[in-house]
UniProtKB/Swiss-Prot annotation:
Species in which this protein is naturally found: Leptospira borgpetersenii serovar Hardjo-bovis (strain JB197)
CDD domains: AAK_UMPK-PyrH-Ec
Listed GO MF terms: ATP binding; UMP kinase activity
Family: Belongs to the UMP kinase family.
Protein name from the UniProt record: Uridylate kinase
Gene: pyrH
Keywords annotated in UniProt: ATP-binding, Cytoplasm, Kinase, Nucleotide-binding, Pyrimidine biosynthesis, Transferase
Length: 246
């Protein structure tokens, strides 16, 4: 059973690593994620990761309580580095060679982000974890994922969430919400479906970088997705919109 993709970028939210109360780092979750990543790596797939920091700090929340927005965002970037190190440790305990590259220079614990070096790591089948966001305030880690995926030539972005795709409405609030199996970037933006921020979606749209939104918490989903099973919601430049059950 081979992979549909040669090189992928997995976007993980901070909550994928969160402990009780959606805060901190749960090492069991980190090791579970590392096992899922190893299964895909064993298929010969080159893997890059971008991880958020919301389980530790959300810059936008700090800005709301009076901290300067740029300062708050820098604090959030540092949180992503903590998560990246936790994920690196978990992956290496599974025997995976891993490199953390940070957009913010922090040389004693991570490489500085250099595109050509990142590509070389991927070619050598090392896991590359991109941390520190874009290195600039006001940009989300979703935008980081879009930017890095385009820069290092990934085939697809796999956006790992706690829901099994993109819905017509919030399924927690609307029992009639339907899941899209496929939707275009433009429709996602126009309908304000909150898949990613508009900057991230626009970057993917302009560079023809498909996104698949899926549930990372269901064991085996990542491998099934990479091997071609129809899981989650595909967002692409195709204007064909498909809704489950229709």
């Amino acid at each position: 059973m081979g992979s549909k993709y040669k090189r992928i970028l997995i976007k993980l939210s901070g909550e994928a690593l969160a402990g009780e109360g959606e805060f901190g780092i749960d090492t069991n979750k980190a090791h579970s994620l590392a096992e899922e990543i190893k299964e895909v790596h064993d298929l010969g797939v080159e893997i890059a990761l971008v991880v958020g920091g919301g389980n530790i700090i959300r810059g936008t929340n700090l800005a709301k309580v009076g901290i300067d927005r740029a300062t708050a965002d820098y604090m959030g970037m540092l949180a992503t580095i903590q998560n990246a190190l936790a994920l690196q440790d978990a992956c290496e305990k599974k025997g995976l060679y891993t490199r953390v590259q940070s957009a913010i220079e922090i040389n004693s614990i991570a490489e500085s982000y250099i595109r050509r070096r990142a590509v070389r790591h991927l070619e050598k089948r090392r896991i590359v974890i991109f941390a520190g966001g874009t290195g600039n305030p006001y940009f989300t880690t979703d935008t980081t994922a879009s930017l890095r995926a385009v820069e290092v030539g990934c085939d697809v972005i796999l956006k790992a969430t706690k829901v099994d795709g993109v819905y017509t409405a919030d399924p927690k609030k609307d029992n009639g919400a339907k899941r899209y199996s496929q939707i275009s970037f433009m429709e996602s933006i126009n309908r304000r479906l909150k898949v990613m921020d508009s900057t991230a979606l626009s970057l993917c749209m302009e560079n023809n970088m498909p996104i698949i939104v899926f549930d990372i918490f269901k064991q085996g989903n990542l491998k099934d997705l990479v091997t071609g099973k129809n899981i989650g919601t595909l967002i692409s430049n195709s204007e064909d919109i498909q809704i489950d059950g229709k």
